[in-house]
């Protein structure tokens, strides 16, 4: 069992000051090894998003940075959902509490602005940047250093923000996230 990171990018409306989910239509392609011991056998997986979700799935390094644990520094302790969270993100979060969602549950609800995340990237010493290999549960797992995982996360948020019409300051862009299993 593992924890997935559920996350959505929100932008602040310049006219009303309200936060809204970043509405984008995007298709991403991800290649995944069918068998961890045979990385040559890759399967093409296409994800389609109606809303900006900069990260899909599990990543223990990013989890440690966002929620704490292991050896990493934590960016911020859980703040809960923002009081002014967009209706769409609030509704998505409520689905995880619904019994019809097959018993999924969430924890570690929080949010960070693009400014906060970008600032964290300036201090590379906090985050190991080497690539590690380790054997765990009989399979080979390749983990990228946590600095690069954070950088990829921030780059994805910037990418999605650029798809939204308008110009946004880094304090007017945030990612709202939680963990679920």
Q: What residue ranges belong to the model's regions?
A:
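Acidic (Asp/Glu-rich) sequence patches and key acidic residues
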Residues: 1-173, 180-181
């Amino acid at each position: 069992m593992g924890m997935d990171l559920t996350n959505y990018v929100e932008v602040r409306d310049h006219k009303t000051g309200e936060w809204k989910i970043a509405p984008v239509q995007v298709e991403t392609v991800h290649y995944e090894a069918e068998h961890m011991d045979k990385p040559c056998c890759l399967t093409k997986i296409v994800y389609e998003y109606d809303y900006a979700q900069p990260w899909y799935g599990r990543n223990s390094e990013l989890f440690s940075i966002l929620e704490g644990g292991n050896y990493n520094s934590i960016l911020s302790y859980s703040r809960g959902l923002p009081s002014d969270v967009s209706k769409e993100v609030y509704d998505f979060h409520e689905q995880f509490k619904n019994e019809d969602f097959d018993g999924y549950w969430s924890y570690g609800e929080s949010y960070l602005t693009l400014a906060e995340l970008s600032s964290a990237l300036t201090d590379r010493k906090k985050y190991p940047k080497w690539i590690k290999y380790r054997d765990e549960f009989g399979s080979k797992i390749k983990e990228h250093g946590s600095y690069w995982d954070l950088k990829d996360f921030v780059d994805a948020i910037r990418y999605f923000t650029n798809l939204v019409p308008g110009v946004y300051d880094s304090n007017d862009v945030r990612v709202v996230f939680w963990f679920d299993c």
